[in-house]
Amino acid sequence: MSNSFPRLGKPAPLFEGDVVRFDSRKKEIFFDTISLNKIIEEKKWTVLFFYPRDFSSLCPTEIHSFNRRIKDFEKANCVLIGCSTDSKNSHKAWMEKPRTKGGIDKLSYPLMADPSLRIARSYGVLQRELGQALRGTFVINDEGILMSLAVNPSKIGRSVDETVR
């Protein structure tokens, strides 16, 4: 694991990455990019949460908990982003697969791919030996300042309600 977390009250590490999104109007899943700089320019807050990997057993529970609360994040002028070290193609395949068959189905927020491990490393959540991230949640204000962080081991879930609060 990387041993240095970003510091509270300081600028969050900038990121830019490929994401997979679902367009509910067109009913299609597509690739896009996202960056913290662009979100800051739009004067929005960001919740960036890391999860260990696609197609795992605990991750869908949290991912769907975040999805059920998407309106709360939007009401708070906040962009929600899920991130793992999987590829964008893995994210897409997972999103295309129904929940009943081990997928996550369509989400109302993007999943960011970090196969280079760069983003997970910059946020201090990379488990180098596994090539995956811990369960980290980072709240970044509309000026790019890190306001909150919480990191859990891979096998321990997080409280989405606490993140919304």
Task: Name each model-derived stretch.
Residues 1-165:
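Chalcogenol-based redox active-site neighborhoods
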